[in-house]
Amino acid sequence: MAQGVVAVERMAGLDVPDLNYVDMPRATYSAPQISSFGLTEQQAKGQGFELKVGRFPFRGNGKALALGDYEGMVKIISDANGGAVLGVHMIGAEVTELLGEASLTRLLKGSTEELAWLVHPHPSLSEAIKEAALAAEDRAIHM
């Protein structure tokens, strides 16, 4: 959809920024769902970043357990120097719905520390993002 909006707005003569395809959210509607944006660990290392990586399995998430659909995980790749979020990768139930929060953190140049401080409803699947951010900071609660 974003590409279409940019194309039409440019045809209308509006000043529109280029799309950032690295940070473009990616969603695969499969069972389980897969969603991601940004760099993978390998890509980030290849670009010379020193990394902090936070992982959190949905097995540790109360909402996923209550739903009986707890396979999968959230993985956050961040710059070890300042914690800038470089990429987020998720596999599990409804993860395509969870990507917006992490993507917004990247757009606003946020860090894993800031993402970790974000308050989430409890219980919710989105708490897995917070937990992965906490894990990147070596402060995971439910691990």
Regions found by a protein language model. Give the residues of each.
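Acidic, glycine-rich loop-and-beta core segments that form the ion-binding/anion-interacting portion
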Residues: M1
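Flexible, glycine-rich terminal cap/loop adjacent to redox cofactors
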Residues: A12-G13, P17, M24, Y29-M143
